Amino acid sequence: MSLTRLLIRDFRNIETADLALSPGFNFLVGANGSGKTSVLEAIYTLGHGRAFRSLQIGCVIRHEQEAFVLHGRLQGEERETAIGLTKDKQGDSKVRIDGTDGHKVAELAHLMPMQLITPEGFTLLNGGPKYRRAFLDWGCFHNEPGFFTAWSNLKRLLKQRNAALRQVTRYEQLRPWDKELIPLAEQISTWRAEYSAGIAADMDDTCKQFLPEFSLTFSFQRGWEKETEYAEVLERNFERDRQLTYTAHGPHKADLRIRADGAPVEDTLSRGQLKLLMCALRLAQGEFLTRESGRRCLYLIDDFASELDDERRGLLASRLKATQSQVFVSAISAEHVIDMSDENSKMFTVEKGKITD
């Protein structure tokens, strides 16, 4: 699946843009603040319903406008799909697929699997466990049809259970919630464990190519003690949970621990090495999706040249080309990306929200 056409209206500093895109590499070149990252963010928002730089809708809609509008055309092997997203200042969204309204953002996410690599993406490695849970959950969402519903129900039940912890005095009063929560927690944990095991070889191979000087290990932690039933953990920790007023153990506390030579990667790797590792993990995830389902990711890479020397940029470019995926790359100068260009690439110049090719 590739994005062949992109229409942007009143998004960030872009009043209007209508772009015909390459199924291969698309380069966005311009000075800082020109709007090149806004194009990447528009694509991301079209596939996620939210921006990656700000959760405040007022920051995303162009100044003095009431809503942004994004439209795209996706070309698959057998058919073309028209998609659209409109979002107003109140945060109300309208999703359109093939001319019909009433669709969910999750449907857009399924149609447009994408990997985002930004200068802020180090949080995957040096941020809290929630960022690595999101990494695992992306894979589960695209590989397990029932994952999104189970995950949504889990979030709802945990919220209800945490509210109940402020009211109850005996564990028996929590059983109605735990009866539903326990099988969901175990199923989600199983999916995550299977996904982390399945992608392990891809992560290992890609990381060896990008960072051969380190021995990297990946360990999935499910969020409660190994070899212990979740039902037992919940009942045993009732008094502590009641004092905390939240559920201290479960899949919402899971993590993917990543170590280099036995130590946490954030304590061992330089910023350039952390970026290489982040890129390696995103590539591995995309390649695993292609092998398992035949679907390809869109790759969005903001500020391609930052933290990477010429050799590492060349390595990343060659691996991206090998995926045969659609890639969007922003850079301050065309010199940073010209070596990646070929006859199928498109180069866009961005200046003050205006985009030309």
UniProtKB/Swiss-Prot annotation:
Key words of the record: ATP-binding, Cytoplasm, DNA damage, DNA repair, DNA replication, DNA-binding, Nucleotide-binding, SOS response
GO terms, biological process: DNA replication; DNA synthesis involved in DNA repair; double-strand break repair; SOS response
Recorded GO MF terms: ATP binding; single-stranded DNA binding
InterPro entries linked: DNA-binding_RecF, DNA-binding_RecF_CS, P-loop_NTPase, RecF/RecN/SMC_N, RecF_2
The organism's place on the tree of life at top rank: Bacteria
SUPFAM superfamilies: P-loop containing nucleoside triphosphate hydrolases (SSF52540)
Stated role: The RecF protein is involved in DNA metabolism; it is required for DNA replication and normal SOS inducibility. RecF binds preferentially to single-stranded, linear DNA. It also seems to bind ATP.
Protein name as annotated: DNA replication and repair protein RecF
Protein's organism: Shigella flexneri serotype 5b (strain 8401)
Phylogenetic lineage: Bacteria, Pseudomonadati, Pseudomonadota, Gammaproteobacteria, Enterobacterales
